[in-house]
A protein has these predicted regions:
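Short active-site neighborhood of thiol/selenol oxidoreductases, capturing the structured segment around
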Residues: 53-68
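Soluble non-cytosolic domains of exported or imported proteins
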Residues: 44, 69-73, 119, 138-142
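Thiol-/selenol-based redox modules, centered on thioredoxin-like
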Residues: 137-182
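Bacterial N-terminal signal peptides
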Residues: 5-15
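N-terminal post-signal-peptidase region of extra-cytosolic proteins
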Residues: 45-49, 65, 76, 106-110
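Typically the conserved alpha-helix immediately C-terminal to a functionally engaged Cys/Sec
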Residues: 48-50, 71-86
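Thioredoxin-like thiol-disulfide oxidoreductase module
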Residues: 80, 91-132, 141, 148-152
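N-terminal "domain-start" segment that seeds a small globular fold
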Residues: 20-49
Length: 182
């Protein structure tokens, strides 16, 4: 009985003395960044491979990231926003660079061929596998939307979307209201 009381005391103290925190601005590992910071766990693991995407003539977005990188955490809502806008029209292939360490780099149908060794890195490839956008760090979602529209041959309309935080961890893409600034 005495042992049970001591055990309960230790368990209660462990939970109160060492709370768990997640922080978008730190380089700590908090778990997978898409469900935690973008509210979209369906992006990982990728639903397709680059090879399949090119074979099916689909536009691909490659996103190379690490779960314990603050810049990658900050971009997760933007990648999730692109998924929301273009879900049925493009393939989003988000890969942690840990997965790429022992892969060969010679094949242009493989994801690692396009990774430049820095994170986060975002690329847009047309249906033929030609790189139309390649950037490390912060991305311009409007520029990516314009590129995707051009590849698809549809008119590009200036974006009326923005990515806004709805709590301290998650963000959502929402319609931009420019009337507030007038």
């Amino acid at each position: 009985m005495k042992l049970l009381i001591i055990f309960c005391y230790l368990v209660i103290n462990l939970y109160t003395l060492f709370p768990v925190y997640a922080s978008r601005s730190s380089d700590s590992y908090d778990g997978n960044i898409f469900p935690i910071y973008a509210g979209n766990g369906s992006i990982v693991p990728p639903q397709t491979t680059l090879r399949d995407s090119i074979n099916n003539k689909r536009i691909s977005i490659l996103f190379f990231y690490l779960d314990d990188n603050s810049d990658s955490k900050a971009l997760a809502p933007a990648i999730s926003g692109l998924d929301l806008i273009w879900r049925n029209s493009i393939d989003i292939i988000a890969l942690t660079t840990d997965e790429l360490q022992n892969r060969k780099q010679e094949d242009p149908n493989e994801e690692k061929f396009y990774w430049n060794g820095l994170i986060p890195q975002t690329l847009v490839l047309d249906g033929e596998g030609n790189v139309k956008y390649d950037k490390n760090g912060t991305i311009d979602i409007d520029q990516i939307n314009k590129i995707i529209s051009e590849i698809k041959g549809i008119d590009y309309e200036e974006s009326s979307f923005s990515i806004e935080s709805f709590n301290e961890y998650n963000s959502i893409i929402s319609k931009r209201d420019d009337t507030k600034n007038k």
